[in-house]
Amino acid sequence: MFEHLFAPITINGMILKNRIVAAPTSDLFEEKALGGAAMVIAGHAIVEPGFSSFASSDEPWPFEKYEREAIHERVMGVHRGGARASVEIFHGGLHARVKEYAKGPCIFIREDGVEVRGMDEAMMQETLDWYAKTCAGAVKAGFDSIFLHFGHGWLPAQFLSPLYNHRTDEYGGSLENRAKLPLRILEVVRNTVGPHYPVDMRISASEWVPEGIAFEDVVEFCKMAEPYIDAIQVSAGIDINKVANVHTVTTNLEEEMPNLKWAREVKHAVNVRVGVVGGMLTPQMAEDAIAAGNVDIVALGRELIADPEWVRKATENRPEDITPCLRCSNCYHIASDHWNVGCSVNPRYHHEAFIPAKIERAEKPKRVVVVGAGPGGMKAAISAYDRGHKVTLIEREPELGGMLRFIAKEPHKGEVARLLAHYRAQIAKRDIDVRLGCEATPQLVKSLEPDALCIAIGATERMPGIEGLEGPHVMVGTQAILRAHELGQRVVILGGGSIGCEIALALAEQGRDVTVIEMSERLAGNANSLYREALRQKFELHSNIHVLVSCSCQKIANGKAHYMMADGAEGALPFDDLVVSTGMAARSQESLAFYGIVRNTVAIGDCTKPSGIMNAVYEGHAFALCV
């Protein structure tokens, strides 16, 4: 199984034990190596202190005297895990956080008021010297390879892209001119590390903006770069530009493996190893991509955040045990503006100081009862069982999953369907007493004599007090998901949160004429900014989606939704069906009835406050660790 994925490969003499590389998306380098990745790329090593970092103008050069021990320990950790170690070599160029001025292809003033100076020959030479110095430091630190970032709108990409490069001298205009500085960088790097040291390069196949570099030019540049490099990793988008960034860190609204089509073309054009990153969600996807000859290597980013043991589980033919990435982007600091960064399915991510990598067995097994089998309840039951406890899981519905059962049926929610299948498989593998179709009562729970009780009964769909909602052809969001193919041509959706927008998109793709009414000023206000941008782009592709924001529904009468805009303007929308998606109401009062049975009682997830999968899974796991 997965024989192509786990075949070894060489890159300029360096042997990789399989075709899977850990992309530079997070720390936990040793865990990724222990999890089976053939090579782990540490990110990011800034090239030019004061001019490179997108995090801080004071970020130290990683190979300074007092940084060397830390960087060397990264290498040693990866080697202890049985993998090769690489490091991302990065220059932010005009996007860098700086104290005085930034360097770029052209002179201009950034939106934040920072001056960008067009690089002259002296500035270029200074940058080239820093590239040489940084790559020499990487070699000396023990890295087995270097990974040059030439994509995502960073300095080399800025010179390559007409979006940024408006120069009229020998470094602007034609591709040959725009490629001069990037090629000089590659030449300096190769001369520094020597002919037998593996050099990898990441490139954006498309920048996803009209003025960006053409894919034909990307392929030609890869050919130009071939004498200096040993491998190319194909990505897409621009990191700082949110319109383009949704194609760098894709959401579940985008196709799976979105960059594979470009990587295939690059591979056919060059004679170096070609890899791809982005949306490679399952071992079978990776196996098929390599078996078809489309790429040589796959890079996993968020997939290894969701499950650092992804590779090991695939090696052992246990794909059902892989915790799937949801492509929700909650792990991405830019998406959340650094608020509540985490992983929806891996409670340890960003909480490494508090959540251990391995679940420890409890000193004394206890009886644990979990009421509710949504994502939080299922995670609580699984983790409590792995702690050695005797677990009873009670669910009033005939199936496990809670709200996941409905969300998984949405057209763009294949990742959620995989998560639901994963949790169901994990529970089936464990000797958990699962009671489906069973209404939990305080009396029933008390009869089980629990030592610890987890209340995970979730939330109910909120029905606002609008006149006429009790009429025909009115339904809540979950009903609309299940009955999507039965709905009429004209659909009005009350509520433009993420679920309401997803329902609107699904119906529009089926040809329905959809209008979304949202009280606030923007759609999907409960989603992170990247997901919101992805929804906006999808909506723009559909002329049959209409949006009314800062708008409230006043009443439903005679088959029409009567509304009022913030400025007092009124109107009425005729509909065949109306969907109410105005949020969730926590079942907190129902939860209260279970308190007093046992002192160790904890309510988790949406029954305390509707807050999504990430919070429910984290709290369910944390409950189990404390029992």
Predicted regions span which residues?
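Flavin-dependent oxidoreductase catalytic cores
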Residues: 1-371, 375, 383-386, 390-391, ...
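A short helix->loop->beta-strand "cap" motif at the edges of active sites that frequently abuts
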Residues: 82-83, 197, 272, 450, ...
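Hydrophobic, well-ordered secondary-structure elements that form the walls
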Residues: 232, 266, 289, 301, ...
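A short helix-to-beta-strand connector/capping loop
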Residues: 294, 427-434, 470-473, 539-546, ...
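Rossmann-like dinucleotide-binding cores of NAD(P)H-dependent redox enzymes
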Residues: 393-430, 506-551, 608
